[in-house]
A protein has these predicted regions:
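Short, small/polar residue-rich loop motifs at catalytic or cofactor-binding pockets
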Residues: 294
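Short, mixed charged/polar active-site loops
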Residues: 307-309
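Predominantly a Rossmann-like dinucleotide-binding segment in NAD(P)-dependent oxidoreductases
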Residues: 41, 154-160, 165-289
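Short beta->alpha connector loops at strand-helix junctions that form conserved
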Residues: 135-137, 163
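Conserved PLP phosphate-binding loop immediately N-terminal to the Schiff-base lysine helix
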Residues: 140-143, 169
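Residue-level detector of conserved catalytic or cofactor/ligand-binding positions
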Residues: 313-330
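N-terminal glycine-/serine-/threonine-rich beta1-alpha1-beta2 phosphate-ribose binding loop
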Residues: 2-134, 143-146, 150-158
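Active-site beta-strand termini and strand-to-loop segments that position acidic
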Residues: 298-304
């Protein structure tokens, strides 16, 4: 006897929500059996992903959650443009996402919020038997990482980092070459992320991407929260951009694992210089001391002997005409 399957049991049997959403044919589900995806965080990244979700006819977004009414207004225009029903809105304070996850019948939730909220939102979703796709990073501490793993294993809910670099065509091509043995035994891999983000971290408080040197409460969009990490932390803030593609090539967590690392940064100069160059020495932000060094270099030792070197620069690169540069090498 053939056993019928509904949307929820189908998603639970899939490897990850992202795969189910991106590769299944659009006519797989009946109109009453569409995947129900909630969105937490409707900023510029959330708006872009909402558009991609709504491009699929087998996906509905019945609910969204955000505390910024400006961003909610912007994402609602995406629904209107695509002639989709206006979603239910949860915007009653920073903890209202818990109400959404507890009350709504969702197959999955996509999270694009300030980084410190990723972990509690992922945990809350999985506790409510909802699969999760979260923007990077999924966690800020080792304990939070293990918390995500333990909760996923206990609840049976998937938790996926939406590391888009892993799915670049060139990256996947090299991964296939590695698995086919084209390069022989790998001994060392390098990953780098060089992206001048100063125009993202500072703006005029009215729009994104430059035009001023404000951040925090006076900033707009990502500058409201993202820049503070550069004030408080000295670290590789984007390890998965470099490490994500390398990990499957070295079979990390598939018979190999990372054992220990050393990480060193240069002095911090670029952020302060940007403020002075664009706001003057008299601007209050010119006096702020940033902990994040301009260049961060990390070397990782693996259990099977390989080494990994990661390089991060969110300030400047050698070619000013190329504001984003992601490089990889395998040896």
């Amino acid at each position: 006897m053939t056993k019928s399957i509904n949307r929820r049991s189908f998603v639970k049997s899939a490897t990850i929500i992202g795969a189910a959403v991106s590769i299944m044919p659009s006519n797989l589900f009946a109109s009453s059996n569409k995947l129900q995806i909630g969105v937490i965080g409707t900023g510029l990244r959330g708006q872009w992903m909402t558009k991609l979700f709504l491009n699929r006819k087998d996906v509905d977004i019945p609910v969204i959650c955000d505390i910024d009414d400006r961003m909610i207004d912007m994402v609602l225009k995406v629904f209107e443009k695509q002639n989709r029903p206006i979603p239910k809105i949860y915007n009653n304070g920073p903890e209202d996402f818990r109400n959404m996850l507890a009350k709504e019948d969702l197959d999955g939730v996509y999270i694009a919020t300030p980084w410190e909220w990723h972990h509690p939102m992922c945990i809350s979703a999985m506790e409510n038997n909802i699969h999760v796709g979260t923007e990077v990073p999924a966690a800020l501490t080792v304990n939070e990482c293990w918390d995500l793993v333990d909760t996923s294993e206990r609840t049976g809910s998937f938790c996926m980092i939406m590391e888009n670099v892993n799915y670049r065509r060139d990256i996947m091509a090299v991964l296939n070459m590695v698995r086919d043995g084209l390069f022989g035994e790998l001994i060392h891999c390098q990953g780098g992320y060089q992206h001048d983000l100063r125009h993202v971290k500072f703006n005029d408080g009215k729009g994104p991407y430059g035009g001023g040197v404000e951040f925090g409460e006076k900033g707009f969009s990502e500058a409201r929260w993202r820049t503070q990490h550069s004030v408080d932390r000295n670290a590789d803030l984007y390890p998965t951009h470099g490490l994500g593609p390398i990990s499957p090539m070295l079979n990390i967590n598939r018979g190999n694992r990372m054992m220990h690392l050393t990480s060193t940064s240069s002095q911090s100069r670029g952020l302060n210089k940007y403020i002075i160059d664009n706001g003057g020495t008299s601007h209050p932000n010119a006096k702020i001391k940033f902990k994040l060094g301009d260049i961060v270099t990390t070397v990782i030792k693996c259990a099977n002997g390989q080494t990994i070197m990661l390089s991060l620069s969110l300030i400047h690169i050698s070619e000013p005409t190329r504001p984003l540069y992601i490089s990889y090498a395998v040896f």
